[in-house]
Design a protein with these regions (language model features):
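Short, positively charged patches
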Residues: 1-138
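Glycine-biased, small-residue-rich flexible motifs in mid-sequence functional cores and linkers
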Residues: 79-417
Length: 417
C-alpha cells in the first residue's frame, strides 16, 4: 500500500541509501513494515536509533501525508514504479518517494539536462540561461532545474518558450510556490511538465533542504550545465554531485573579472566541458538517443529573438552593489550584503581556518557535527549516531558545512574537518 511507502520514506535516523537497502532486503515496504524487529539487523549500517524508528508502526503521520496529497492534488511516484527515473536509481541515495504535480516525462527515453546557477545572475547569465534552455528543448532535450529565481527560472522559461516540458525539483513541498515571485512559472511548468519533491506536502523551504535536493537534479540528468556561479554557490554543489554520480558537467565560460562567474570558471579549470550552444551538450548523447536528439534543429546563438532576450535582460534582478565590484572580497571582512543572503551562496571556506573560530559562527546543529568530527575522520553514519540528529538533517548540514569550507568529504562515505 502507498501508505507503507510513505511510512518507510519518512523514517527518521535512517539514510536514504539504507532505506533502499531495506527495500531490497524485504522486497517491498509492506514487508519492511510488518517485519519482526530482529530481522532488521540483517541490514548492515542501521543505528540503534534507526532500529527504533522501524519499530514505530504508527501510520498516522503517513496517512496525514496521503490525505494532504489528495487535498493538494499531488500524485505519488515510488521507487518501484515503472516511471521512476532509472538513472536516479544508480546514485547512492535515491529518494523512495516523490510527490509531484503535472505530467511525468519519459525520464529514461529522453536526454534530461540539469541547468543550474546563481539566483543573483548578471543580465548576460540570465539571457544565456534562457537561450540555452530554449536550444536544449528545441533539440529534443528536457531541462531539469530547481525553480529558483535567476538562472534556474530563466532556463525553464526558455524551454517552455520552445514548446517543450520542463522538470522542476523543489526543496519544499511540491504544492508550495517558492519563491512566490515565480508563481506564473510554476503554473506553466505544472501545465506542460512536472514539479517534483521528495519532501512531503507542508514541508517549508528550509535552507538545509536545498543542498539535499541538488543530488536529484544531477542524478536524473545525463549531464549538468552550470551557467553562472560565484565561488560558493549552491550550483557548485550540484556540479559536485554530478561529478560524483558520473554525470557530465558543462559550463558557460564567463567574464573573469565578474565575481558571479568565479565558481563556474573554476569548474572549467577542473575539467568541465565548455559550452557555447546546446549542441555542445546534446552532441554528447546523440548516440544514446538517436531518435530523440534532433541535430537538424540545433539552433545558433541567435535563435531566440532579440526581443525575447531583451525581455529576459530586463527581468534580471540587479546584482547587489557589492557583488558588482570586479574583485574578490576580503577574507577577513565579508560584506554584509553577502552575509545576509542564503547560506549556500555565502563566501565561506576562506573565513574559517581554525575550529575554535568556527563554532561561534555556526548553528547549534552545525556545532554538534563539527564537535563530532574533531577526533578525526568519521563515517557519516557514526556522525548521525553520535549527534542523535535525523539522518536527513545531518546529510544536509554536512553539505552546508562543505560549502562553507568547514568539512571535507572523503572516499568511502567519510568526513573530516
Amino acid at each position: 500500500m502507498i501508505v507503507h511507502w510513505i511510512w518507510l520514506a519518512t523514517r527518521p535516523n535512517i539514510t536514504d541509501w539504507l532505506k533502499v537497502e531495506l527495500l531490497h532486503s524485504f522486497q517491498d515496504p509492506e514487508n519492511v513494515y510488518f517485519a519482526e524487529a530482529d530481522s532488521y539487523k540483517q541490514v548492515e549500517g542501521l543505528t540503534p536509533e534507526g532500529l527504533e524508528s522501524l519499530k514505530d508502526k504508527d501510520l498516522r503521520t503517513a496517512e496525514k501525508i496521503l490525505a494532504d496529497c489528495h487535498r493538494e492534488h499531488l500524485q505519488i511516484l515510488t521507487y518501484q514504479d515503472a516511471a521512476y527515473p532509472s538513472r536516479l536509481k544508480n546514485i547512492s541515495d535515491p529518494p523512495l518517494v516523490f510527490y509531484y504535480k503535472g505530467r511525468l516525462p519519459d525520464f529514461d527515453g529522453l536526454p534530461l539536462i540539469g541547468v543550474v546557477g546563481t539566483r543573483h545572475a548578471s543580465p548576460y547569465g540570465m539571457t544565456t540561461a534562457k537561450k540555452l534552455g530554449y536550444q536544449i528543448a528545441k533539440c529534443g532535450g528536457i531541462v531539469v532545474s530547481g525553480m529558483a529565481y535567476g538562472i534556474d527560472g530563466m532556463a525553464m522559461k526558455g524551454a517552455l518558450t520552445a514548446g517543450a516540458p520542463a522538470v522542476g525539483i523543489l526543496g519544499c513541498g511540491a504544492e508550495m510556490i517558492y519563491p512566490p515571485s515565480n508563481r506564473p512559472l510554476f503554473a506553466d511548468v505544472e501545465n506542460y511538465g512536472c514539479i517534483m519533491s521528495e519532501f512531503p506536502p507542508g514541508t517549508p523551504p528550509v535552507k538545509w533542504n536545498f543542498p539535499k535536493r541538488n543530488r536529484i537534479i544531477s542524478g536524473m540528468s545525463c549531464g549538468v550545465l552550470v551557467v553562472e556561479a560565484p565561488e560558493k554557490s549552491g550550483a557548485l554543489i550540484t556540479a559536485r554531485c554530478a561529478a560524483d554520480q558520473g554525470r557530465d558537467v558543462f559550463v558557460v565560460p564567463g567574464n573573469i573579472d565578474v565575481p558571479t562567474f568565479v565558481g563556474s570558471n573554476r569548474l572549467l579549470r577542473d575539467g568541465a566541458i565548455a559550452v557555447s550552444s546546446s549542441w555542445d551538450i546534446l552532441s554528447e548523447y546523440e548516440m544514446q538517443f538517436p531518435d530523440k536528439i534532433r541535430k537538424d534543429t540545433a539552433v545558433s546563438r541567435q535563435s531566440v529573438s532579440e526581443e525575447e532576450l531583451q525581455k529576459a535582460a530586463e527581468a534580471a534582478k540587479p546584482l547587489p552593489k557589492v557583488a558588482q565590484k570586479s574583485r574578490i572580497f576580503s577574507k577577513k571582512q565579508p560584506p554584509k550584503e553577502i552575509e545576509d543572503k542564503k547560506v549556500i551562496d555565502k563566501a565561506g571556506s576562506s573565513l574559517y581556518s581554525d575550529v575554535n573560530d568556527i563554532l561561534p559562527k555556526l548553528s547549534e546543529q552545525e556545532q554538534q557535527i563539527v564537535t563530532a568530527l574533531q577526533g578525526g575522520e568519521r563515517l557519516v553514519d557514526d556522525v548521525i549516531a553520535q549527534t542523535g540528529l535525523p539522518a536527513g538533517k545531518v546529510l544536509a548540514t554536512l553539505t552546508l558545512l562543505e560549502v562553507k569550507g568547514v568539512v571535507k568529504r572523503l572516499p568511502g562515505k567519510r568526513i573530516c574537518l
